[in-house]
Amino acid sequence: MFEKLEESSGNVIGFRLTGKLTDADYKAIGPEFEKAIENSGKIRLLWLLEDFKGWEAKAAWDDYEYWRKYGKNMEQVAIVGNKRWEDWMAKLAKLFLKGGVKYFDDSQLEDAWAWDRKGASE
């Protein structure tokens, strides 16, 4: 499940990801991406992974499609979690995203927000 975080503002959007993501989750989040891209052009994302279990099969394909569709508009992505495989997921995301991708331990949530708001190159 995706849950938009209230700290989101402007072109910096954060989501809590919990459980196993479904096709319905991706259908629900699409309008959020499109609205932010329409308003700002480029977006910066923060994924807060809490008890994240991965993707159902269709949702894994949706994830790939979203990176293809919206990747050019994603300026950078902060991934916050506490598992080694989540760090590897961040490294894999760098292959699909021209902007910055950085992994933060869950104890570094405020640092992740600051990095996203400031910009990877600043």
Language-model features, listed with the residues they occupy:
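Amphipathic, Lys/Arg-enriched alpha-helical "gate/interface" segment within cytosolic domains
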Residues: 2-122
